[in-house]
């Protein structure tokens, strides 16, 4: 059993694959649409069809596949495919929009609406069509239309999105390329926050809306498989959430860095210190001391080139990354730009890929100098690491990990700060971390500058570490998280079968990590899991609740790269 993703570039097939992999559904295969006539729904129960100009050419084959019993998941269907799905296209829909889920509970949501941007069409639907979600305009009663539909076609079905999901998630997470280098009077230099797509009112900032939208897609795929599908856990061990801790060195004294690092280490955590190589006060000896317990990375500062060309700023960005590596003899694994300064759209990320940086933390939540929304996921709605994707659908091998809190923006007395007291932060933080552990199961990421930590934000930082311990959250550095994520990225499922009582599959990967686990549903179709075997040997497992679903977590043995798994239900 496998998931088939039709690949006919230019399209977003690679980004849809990245969504499946991000959420652990590593059971997919990209194929050319020409294989559709021979595709057996018993072997490939789900076919994902990205929005592209070529879909009309093989629409008949998609419809025939659905009639044979398969599930087609498509986006912006046209012509014969739209008619088979019981839809009639009435043209482009005005943006921005909100998606209201109506048929099935969506993971991580509790009635909230999801922002939708990008390319959206208005469809009328036939009476036999089941509507799974509706699209509406924020602040307006008129203009509602279907957002996601499901239609029986022969022995199978067609699930249709009225919008290009991949483009929508890309724009939400990475921002809008049309906003690159657009400056404002409040922030007269290019910043990552200024890329944020226009989603209308800030009513979704307390949920990682871009991630939950991609998770909705993944769960629709899972429904189509009609089996207790395994997933790679995206968190280490049995953790229900994560705290990713970092600090930007800026002009900090080495003693200030040590003070914050001591506090984090005493809490059992590890942090990243991001260093500006052109003006750090830390020596090579200092950095070696930091590395005994923590991680370091570059913090390029291109602000001296405000107003200069994108090309000049990119050259300085690359120069400082290389300078950091040469100064401290440390590979640059992850980074964050000083002041979140940026150049162009994805050009800095392409440089990261070229020089070996594999995770970027420069996209900061909130609406800094645009309005006064401080919610943890405001602006980009993302907490999960995903590879960057170019607007033409090609992936960049750099993971985008958003930063949710910067201490100067939240606690300082500066004009732009929200100026929250410790007492108020305690209440907000309890909500944020509780949601992370019980609803979203995603990392919460922070930047506590050492200079600020010793001056005004130390109490908030210690409260964060205290509540993280209370919620049993691992406290990791970005580099540590990246190491886990890179190892997880190598693992795939294959040869999956389900006979109604026994689930069997092969799990294989090239890089081990002691935090890696896979998980399967504890209950399925009236049955309950009662045994897991790895290579024929009964193994221990632990039941946890993830997104309201009882899941069984099984550690992946560190010494193995290929495992035969058998799971019995009764």
Where are each of the predicted segments found?
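A glycine-rich, often tryptophan-bearing local segment used as a flexible ligand/cofactor-contacting loop or short
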Residues: 53-125, 138
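Catalytic grooves of carbohydrate-active enzymes
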Residues: 163, 195-202, 247-249, 355, ...
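C-terminal domain-boundary segment and adjacent tail
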Residues: 31, 217-237, 423-510, 524
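Metal-dependent polysaccharide deacetylase catalytic core of the NodB/CE4 family, i.e.
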Residues: 85, 240-243, 253-255, 261-348, ...
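A glycine-centered loop/beta-turn motif at secondary-structure junctions
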Residues: 2-3, 14-26, 67, 71, ...
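Active-site-adjacent pocket scaffolds in enzyme catalytic domains
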Residues: 93-119, 123-125, 151, 295, ...
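Helical hinge/lid and interdomain linker segments adjacent to catalytic or ligand-binding clefts
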Residues: 2-84, 308
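C-terminal beta-strand-rich structural cap/linker in extracellular carbohydrate-active enzymes
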Residues: 514, 545-570
């Amino acid at each position: 059993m496998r998931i088939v993703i039709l690949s006919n570039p230019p399209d977003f097939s690679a980004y849809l694959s990245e969504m499946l992999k991000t959420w652990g559904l590593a059971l997919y295969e990209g194929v050319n649409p020409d294989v559709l006539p021979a595709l057996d729904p018993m072997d490939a129960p789900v076919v994902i069809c990205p929005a592209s100009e070529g879909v009309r050419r093989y629409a008949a084959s998609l419809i025939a596949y659905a009639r044979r019993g398969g599930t087609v998941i498509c986006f912006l269907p046209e012509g014969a495919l739209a008619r088979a799905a019981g839809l009639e296209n009435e043209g482009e829909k005005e943006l921005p929009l909100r998606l209201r889920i109506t048929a099935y509970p969506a993971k991580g949501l509790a009635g909230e609406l999801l922002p939708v941007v990008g390319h959206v069409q208005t469809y009328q639907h036939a009476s036999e069509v089941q509507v799974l979600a509706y699209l509406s305009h924020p602040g307006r009663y008129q203009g509602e239309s279907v957002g996601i539909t499901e239609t029986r076609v022969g022995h199978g079905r067609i699930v249709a999105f009225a919008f290009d999901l991949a483009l929508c998630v890309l724009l939400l997470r990475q921002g809008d390329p049309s906003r690159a280098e657009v400056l404002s009077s409040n922030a007269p230099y290019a910043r990552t926050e200024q890329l944020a797509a226009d989603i209308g009112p800030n009513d979704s900032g307390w949920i990682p809306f871009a991630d939950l939208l991609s998770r909705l897609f993944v769960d629709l795929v899972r429904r189509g498989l009609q089996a207790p599908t395994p997933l790679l856990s995206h968190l280490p061990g049995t953790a229900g959430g994560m705290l990713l801790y970092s600090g930007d060195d800026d002009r900090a004294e080495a003693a200030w860095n040590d003070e914050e690092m001591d506090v984090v280490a005493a809490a059992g955590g590890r942090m990243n210190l991001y260093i500006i190589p052109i003006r750090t006060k830390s020596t090579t000896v200092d950095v070696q001391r930091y590395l005994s317990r923590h991680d370091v990375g570059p913090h390029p500062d291109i602000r001296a080139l405000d107003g200069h060309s994108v090309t000049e700023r990119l050259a300085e960005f690359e120069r400082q990354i290389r300078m950091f590596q040469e100064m401290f003899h440390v590979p640059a694994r992850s980074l964050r730009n000083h002041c979140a300064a940026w150049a162009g759209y994805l050009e800095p990320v392409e440089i990261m890929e070229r020089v070996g940086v594999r995770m970027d933390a420069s996209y900061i939540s909130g609406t800094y100098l645009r309005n006064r929304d401080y919610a943890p996921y405001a602006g980009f709605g993302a907490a999960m690491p995903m590879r960057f994707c170019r607007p033409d659908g090609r992936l960049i091998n750099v993971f985008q990990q958003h930063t949710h809190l910067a201490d100067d923006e939240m606690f300082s007395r500066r004009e732009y700060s929200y100026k929250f007291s410790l007492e108020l932060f305690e209440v907000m933080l309890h909500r944020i971390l509780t949601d992370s552990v019980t609803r979203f199961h995603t990392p919460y990421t922070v930047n506590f500058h050492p200079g600020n930590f010793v001056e005004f934000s130390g109490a908030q930082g210690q409260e964060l570490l205290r509540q993280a311990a209370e919620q049993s959250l691992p406290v990791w550095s970005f580099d540590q998280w990246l190491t886990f994520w890179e190892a997880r990225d190598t693992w795939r499922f294959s040869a999956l079968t389900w006979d109604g009582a026994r689930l069997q599959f092969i799990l294989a990967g090239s890089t081990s990590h002691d935090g890696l686990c896979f998980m399967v549903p504890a209950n399925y179709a009236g049955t309950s899991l009662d045994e897991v075997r790895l290579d024929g040997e009964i193994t221990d497992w632990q039941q946890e609740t993830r997104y309201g679903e009882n899941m069984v977590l099984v550690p992946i043995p560190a010494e193995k790269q290929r495992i035969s798994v058998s799971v019995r239900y009764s």
